[in-house]
Amino acid sequence: MKRKWERDLGLQGRMLFTMFLLAAVYLFFLAFLSYSGTPPVFMLLFVGAFMGIQYFYSDKMVLWTTGAHIVSESEAPQLHDMVTRLCVIADIPKPQIAIVQTRVPNAFATGRSPNKAVVAVTTGIMDKLTPAELEAVLAHELSHVKNRDMAVLTIASFISTIAFYIVRYSLYFGGMGGDRRRDGGGILLVWLVSIAVWVVSFLLIRALSRYREFAADRGSAIITGQPANLASALMKISGLMDRVPSEDLRKVEGMNAFFIIPAISGSSFMDIFSTHPSVEKRLAQLEKMQKEMS
């Protein structure tokens, strides 16, 4: 049975405001590059090609990076049954399902659209969670698929990536041309503005990522009708992460942005640099939803 996908207007408002700020920063940056005489065509083409590959082949890249193995219904019947049932409720096509052989208890989703998605779980999470908790985690990942989060964040980071490459290479290549910038002062100005744009956009993209994690948590609660199950799973995963050997955690640290909980997380002081909200904030939202649904 399909469930109504109710909107959280406050969360949507924060996401839209963040995207508005991001767009404003990007428009300023493009206007500045045009005024300074910087020909951004080459950089646009280079970064566009790079991000196009990421956009269209992200699922294959992530599977290769993690060593995830696509499993058939005969190989993982219970997992397939769970995902099939959740997809009917969420009203999305069933994605491919993969398993990663690692003790790290985690899960992730990738793919540019609901029709080209992969949802993966680790053997660590399958061994430790109850069926209800695992179902809640899968519903969280399917919410990312339904919300097209991979596509949104790839597009959002496009100009930020251009700013990063200008910062990295402009001093080496004399600012990449442009009449107004042939002097050292002009090159330095472009470099400084690019740094500012990259830092601001980096923080905004991280904020957008955290909001979309909140949205996926909310989606899981709506799909399963049991926010407490995801809350229980998050607490269990967070606690289990401390018991996993640091060597195993470092192997998958590059996948933190995709995981339901980062394999290695910093202090609360570093929250503004994190792709995920703190577990405490996520639990507070789920507790509020549990009360609303009771």
From Swiss-Prot:
Membrane topology: Multi-pass membrane protein
InterPro entries xrefs: HtpX_protease, Pept_M48_protease_HtpX, Peptidase_M48
Subcellular locations according to the entry: Cell membrane
Coiled-coil region(s): none
Its EC number(s): 3.4.24.-
Cellular component annotations (GO), alphabetically ordered: plasma membrane
Alphabetic keyword roster: Cell membrane, Hydrolase, Membrane, Metal-binding, Metalloprotease, Protease, Transmembrane, Transmembrane helix, Zinc
Gene Ontology MF annotations: metalloendopeptidase activity; zinc ion binding
Record's protein name: Protease HtpX homolog 2
Residues of the active site: 141
Cofactor: how and how many bound: Binds 1 zinc ion per subunit.
Transmembrane intervals: 15-35, 37-57, 151-171, 185-205
Family affiliation: Belongs to the peptidase M48B family.
Cofactor or coenzyme needed: Zn(2+)
The species this protein was found in: Methanosarcina acetivorans (strain ATCC 35395 / DSM 2834 / JCM 12185 / C2A)
Pfam families in UniProt: Peptidase_M48 (PF01435)
Gene3D superfamilies (UniProt xref): Metalloproteases ('zincins'), catalytic domain
Any one GO BP annotation for this protein: proteolysis
PANTHER family: PROTEASE HTPX, PROTEASE HTPX HOMOLOG
Main location class: membrane
Binding site residues for Zn(2+): 140, 144, 213
